[in-house]
A protein has these predicted regions:
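PP2C/PPM-type serine/threonine phosphatase catalytic domain
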Residues: 1-224
């Protein structure tokens, strides 16, 4: 939960070949409700889907979006709530993913850490425009402003992709409680020096606390 927040607005689920992370936002417990709704709806949708492919991951997030938008329409006090979502599934030799918001998917391969998802955030737009550097994203005053989130509008575009993977690849999903405080280079360094994924988690969470732990943090690490 971190050192500052009183509520944990992060949620996740892990099954045999699918995992997801959500990070909610909004007042009156809205963030907690949105992230819980999203992860539950995504999990239920995918568990009832006979074939998992890139389209079904996108559809799962869109399904969650509709459910949250409808909930907000019924309860005005929840207006403004929403959540990030990143969903990953391993199918054969491919990693399928879908994403909205600034929760991230990384892959670590051959001692290189690559961010697969693109943040839907104000600071990402500034980075793309060449106005700030990757390092400046972490300390920018607008780093928490999202340009896209699940549950905010009926029309939602979900990023998605398919990535070939091989034995030994490591994947990392996280909320901005990690990526908003710890640099990509530090994450790469930890993965380089530590083979045990549980120890990786413990080390990164310790780093977050050393950096102030101003947000909830959720991290999933796995090896193909």
């Amino acid at each position: 939960i971190g050192l500052v927040r009183k509520q944990n607005e992060d949620r996740f689920f892990i099954s045999d070949n699918i995992c997801a992370v959500t990070d909610g936002m909004g007042g009156y417990r809205g963030g907690e409700i949105a992230s819980t709704y999203a992860v539950d709806e995504i999990k239920e949708y995918l568990q009832s889907t006979p074939t998992i492919n890139e389209t079904s991951l996108v559809d799962a997030i869109l399904h969650a979006n509709t459910r949250i938008v409808n909930r907000v329409a019924r309860e005005e006090r929840l207006s403004g709530m929403g959540t990030t979502a990143v969903v990953v599934a391993k199918v054969d030799d491919n990693l399928l993913w879908a994403s909205v918001g600034d929760s991230r998917l990384y892959i670590y391969r051959n001692d290189e850490l690559t961010q697969i998802t693109t943040d839907h955030s104000m600071v990402q737009q500034l980075l793309d425009a060449g106005e700030i550097t990757k390092e400046e994203m972490i300390v920018h005053p607008q780093r928490n402003l999202l340009t896209r989130a699940v549950g905010v509008e009926e029309d939602l575009h979900v990023d998605s992709g398919t990535l070939p993977v091989k034995s030994g690849d490591r994947i990392l999903l996280c909320t901005d409680g990690l990526s908003g405080y710890i640099s990509d280079e530090r994450i790469r360094e930890v993965l380089h020096h530590i083979d045990d994924n549980t120890e990786v988690l413990n080390t990164l969470i310790a780093d977050v606390y050393d950096a102030g732990a101003g947000d909830n943090v959720t991290i999933i690490v796995g090896t193909i």
